[in-house]
């Protein structure tokens, strides 16, 4: 129904004459000669190759009467989207010289009835209007989603940092308790093997808690010069014996005072080894 070649000729002529805006071409030029199309807002009619008109529904009857008054010969129209009876009512006394052929209304999804534009001239969705309509709702939703994503990222980063710090502290305590271990590959398996070596038949959980507390004590500033050289645990008597090495005798006195809060402390004989002092301490829970 659309004269595509006519549209191409018009578009080429506009381009050759430096007219680049498509809006200068009247909308009625999109339909064939002798056609009239109507939708919910307007009526367009093409009289011949160079003449036509476009009007709203209120002004359309006046334009149609003017067309009939200008043309003395019988008028033949092919209409889309408008009832022939309505045209006859518009024509009034001149309805007898009017021949109307009605075609089914053409409806494109999302477009009004009576739209005959196809191909490169087919109406497009105005995304700018859609954005102006929905941005009031979309922007706050996007801000909320971004805030939730940032909060989630910060939470995951914080948890990862806490896990890394806990692992570092556990490794430092392990190396303090077992100085013969020079490198940590698998902390869990190395702790298990070390506990089996020093105490084959005991409650691992309880002993590990005891050793962790002692390691934290040895890492304090006042006792940082004391080094753990080994330990043994008597499961039957619930006695923990530590082999230690310190810078001087005073360090052992400080250690004994600190441990006396939770343990019954018995100190073995101390021996001078060059610039350091070595000896043992036996602990029993109060």
UniProtKB/Swiss-Prot annotation:
Q: Name one GO biological process term.
A: protein secretion by the type II secretion system
Q: What is its induction?
A: Expressed at low levels in exponential phase in rich medium (at protein level).
Its annotated compartments are: Cell inner membrane
The coiled-coil segments of this chain are none
Residues of the signal peptide: none
This protein's UniProt keywords: Cell inner membrane, Cell membrane, Membrane, Protein transport, Transmembrane, Transmembrane helix, Transport
Q: Cellular component terms, GO, for this chain's entry? A: Gram-negative-bacterium-type cell wall; plasma membrane; type II protein secretion system complex
Q: What protein family does this chain belong to?
A: Belongs to the GSP L family.
Record-given protein name: Putative type II secretion system L-type protein YghE
Q: Which gene encodes it?
A: yghE
């Amino acid at each position: 129904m659309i004269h595509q070649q006519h549209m191409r000729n018009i578009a080429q002529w506009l381009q050759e004459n430096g007219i680049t805006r498509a809006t200068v071409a009247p909308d009625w030029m999109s339909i064939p000669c002798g056609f009239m199309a109507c939708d919910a807002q307007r009526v367009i009619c093409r009289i011949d190759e160079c003449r036509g008109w476009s009007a709203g529904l209120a002004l359309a009857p006046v334009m149609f009467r003017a067309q009939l008054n200008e043309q003395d010969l019988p008028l033949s129209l092919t209409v889309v989207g408008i009832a022939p009876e309505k045209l006859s009512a518009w024509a009034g006394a001149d309805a007898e010289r009017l021949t109307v052929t009605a075609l089914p209304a053409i409806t494109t999804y999302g477009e009004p009835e009576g739209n005959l534009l196809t191909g490169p001239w087919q109406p497009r969705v105005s995304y700018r209007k859609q954005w102006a309509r929905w941005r009031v709702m979309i922007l706050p939703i996007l801000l909320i989603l971004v805030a939730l994503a940032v909060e989630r990222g910060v939470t995951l980063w914080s948890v990862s940092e806490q896990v890394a710090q806990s692992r570092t502290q556990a490794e430092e305590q392990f190396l303090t308790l077992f100085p013969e271990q020079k490198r940590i590959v698998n902390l869990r398996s190395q702790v298990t093997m070390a506990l089996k070596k020093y105490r084959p038949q005991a409650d691992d959980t309880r002993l590990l808690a005891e050793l962790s507390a002692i390691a934290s004590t040895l890492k304090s500033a006042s006792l940082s010069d004391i080094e753990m050289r080994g330990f043994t645990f008597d499961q039957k008597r619930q006695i923990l014996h530590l082999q230690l090495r310190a810078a001087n005798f005073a360090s052992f006195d400080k250690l004994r005072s600190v441990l006396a809060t939770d343990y019954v402390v018995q100190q073995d004989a101390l021996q001078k080894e060059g610039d350091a002092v070595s000896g043992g301490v036996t602990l029993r829970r109060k």
